[in-house]
Amino acid sequence: MNKILSRLFVLLIFVLTGCEQKGCAAEVEYEFLTPQVLVIKNPKPYMHTSHNVVKQGLWQKENALFRDKNGNILRKADVTTFAYFIFEKPLKDGETVSIAGTAAKYDSAVPSNIFKLNQVGNGVNQKQKYAYMGAWLGNLGALPLKHLAGKEFEIRRSSDGKTVCKGILKMRREDSMYQGNIPFTGEEVLELDYSNFNTPGKYYFYVENIGRSMEFVIDSSALNEAFYIHARGLYHKRCGIAKTQPFTAWESPACHQTVQLGRVPGNADHYRKGKTEKDFGFFDIKDNRIEVKHFDLIKDNPPYQQKIITAPGGWHDAADYDRRPYHLRIVSDLAAVYLMKPENFIDGQLNIPESGNGIPDILDEAAWGVKHLLAVQQDNGGVGTWFETTGHPGQGEGLPDNEKRSYYVSAPSRNGTMEYAAAVSTLALAMKKAGAKSEAEKYLASAVKAWNFAIDPGNRAVSWLRYKNKMISYREEPFLYGENLLKAGVNLFLLTGERKYLEPVLEDQKRIQESFSKDFWRWSPLTWMVLELYPVTEFAQLRNEYRKVILRDAEKMLENQENTYPYRTLWHAHNAGWVHAMAWGNYHPLRRAVTLIAAHKLTGEEKYLTGAYLANDFHNGANPLGRSMTSGLGKIYPAVFLDLVSYADNIGEFVPGITPYGNTFGIDRNAVKMVYNNNADKLPIFRRYVNLEFLSVPSSEYSVWETIAPAAVTTGYLLEKPTLPSTELKNRKPAGEFRKLPGYRALP
């Protein structure tokens, strides 16, 4: 029987990889999930084994795109083949098995990745805490674990191995199935509930005849570390400033110090041909609504006069270097979370260049997000909010400071300027709260100028432009977006006491209500938090509507978190209409948990805070893949992703604090063609984190506003005892070549 299985294994390797030994991806690695279950990475075809194998399986997964000897990225997947072996009997500690060209020694002291837990650690105030056990064995399916339910697990202290707590393994709910046949996790999942254990320290889990977990921490410092890494993801994406020691070991020169005044509109949504918009957007000479490519429009409409403005500030949007209007959400949300929990944020907390100026670092980071916009604000108050060029930078063009393209700031519009007014006035409120009087006055003055421009209908953006050798026209909406009008008006009223800022809002309440009902799903959950923090009598109804929607969404998330999947996550239920919409970071638990921290602030109810803690657990490794979702965070984290700076900086490890988009529900067609072929449908949905870098943008890229900032906002709210960063965090060095990191060939 064993010989037959061995021959089948050789055949499977040829079928799955299409290669002999010399064509396989890299050196052989192995790990034991249990004393009886071995995983070999990149196995050699074999005809014998020293131990009887009762089951064996295979899977292959891309790690990234292949690099040639010069470091050039090829349109070829670097694939790892995973071979799974279940032996007839468990190995003893120190016993060696010879199999698939490998001598694998079982060492009970080596942590098993069958344990899925928060790799950064839990705070001491977290009311519910869970780790999980589970594994997916490729075409073998779930590792059987149901028989362990009811058995004991231990928490052992790392320093001496002493058992400090015991609990009972429990089965989590059955795996959900999409349309009855596609699993979400592919696992049988056990739960380790340690909610009643809160003693600070370093520990690991132990289960007899299974093994031990990696270390985990219970301490407030774990939350400080998570917030630090996430928030510094923004610092590492700053534009216009050199990143240097002592603030980071991931150094790069200052970039994009200047910008030219451009002529094109700054609302990205208008460039797409809408289905219903008839009186705003782009139009041909016959007044038909048309779609326009922004790169082409910028090329075809250079400035009438070259006016160069020094404007460092803002953040690179993602892998490339544009600075977008969406980033104003970051400014607003960082300021809002400070107003929600000012006791959580202090000066010096993030080790950034502004640390030591007496202002909480989170507000300094928010201020960087408007620094460039202050520089381009026109005398009449108008602000262009999109900094863009004529094409995407690419591999081989070097660091951002080497970019040869000119950047242009979009023409001011009423709505873009009002969005700026809403964000910068929120920052002014936060600066005032922090006692930073001069900064608050500076941002207030800019917000007032922006308001005066935006509130004037005569400043509606209307223009003629050239596009592909034809003349086209553009006109923005004849109205102001309700969310920004209300937020800016209320903020300015609170800052000045002048009711004139409320009058346009009161006059437009009906349309604002309609906008809220239709479009709130697109807004940040913190958009109208100001109505809760500083109630204005005239807007009591809107405040109540805001509360209702936040609490409705939060309740649904908590229900899904507890009852839908084996691992507690905030994603839509398996049979919900939006379950497929995972791509572009929508799936991220810390992004979704912003709703939960809003609900907690509105009500003070512990359940919402607990839900946000559990979302942080999932993000940090208590998930089906057993990985942290953010580079440099935890022990197994994304080792490579689409990031042009990390490609060019000659630093082995990619920049920390970046949260790639990750799961996409479907599988990228490039991955199907290059890796999975007919096996694609067999990959469980929560394992569909395809990484082919620029060939799989919806999963391999990221953005500062979709994935990085929300994680900083949520973890900032969760902080229990804010402190200055440890010397270890401040002095962290790159770990080395990214292919050597545990996250590169992590289990699929």
Regions found by a protein language model. Give the residues of each.
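Acidic, glycine-anchored loop motifs typical of Ca2+
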Residues: 354-358, 362
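Acidic, Ser/Thr/Gly/Pro-rich low-complexity segments and short DxT(G/T)-type signature motifs
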Residues: 89-112
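Surface-exposed, short loops/turns at beta-strand junctions within beta-sandwich domains
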Residues: 87-93, 195-200
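Low-complexity, Pro/Ser/Thr- and charge-rich linker/hinge segments at domain boundaries
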Residues: 106-128, 213-252
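Short acidic/polar inter-strand loop motif in beta-rich domains
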Residues: 101-102, 209-215
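Bacterial Sec-dependent signal peptides at the C-terminal "C-region" and cleavage site
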Residues: 12-25
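Sec-dependent signal peptide recognition
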Residues: 2-11
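Aromatic (Trp/Tyr) and acidic
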Residues: 24-81, 120-121, 127-208, 236-328, ...
